[in-house]
């Protein structure tokens, strides 16, 4: 399963939200990947996420595969759409 979402928090996917993303992705048995401009990274790897340099307004695709893929995808989308809990 996959869905495109846009990073909405002011500071983009810097260290704190990236660590939140990894922590959330690691809760699932399914694989979770981020895709940006053709580059695909494991969303359970903070280094992978950080190397993408995702700023506010960047569109990414979240892809999940596995037994809990729907729950994983919905949870990851919710995290991004809520701006990782940062004030807007």
Where are these regions (language model features)?
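Absolute protein N-terminus
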Residues: 1-3
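Compact, glycine-rich, soluble single-domain proteins
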Residues: 6-47, 51-57
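C-terminal structural segments of small proteins and small subunits
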Residues: 55-88
């Amino acid at each position: 399963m996959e869905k495109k979402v846009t990073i909405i928090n002011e500071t983009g996917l810097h260290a704190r939200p990236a660590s939140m993303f990894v922590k959330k992705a690691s809760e699932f048995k399914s694989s979770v990947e981020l895709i940006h401009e053709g580059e695909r990274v494991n969303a359970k790897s903070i280094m992978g996420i950080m190397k993408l340099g995702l700023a506010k307004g960047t569109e990414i695709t979240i892809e999940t595969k596995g037994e809990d893929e729907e729950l994983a995808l919905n949870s990851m989308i919710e995290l991004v759409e809520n701006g990782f809990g940062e004030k807007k």
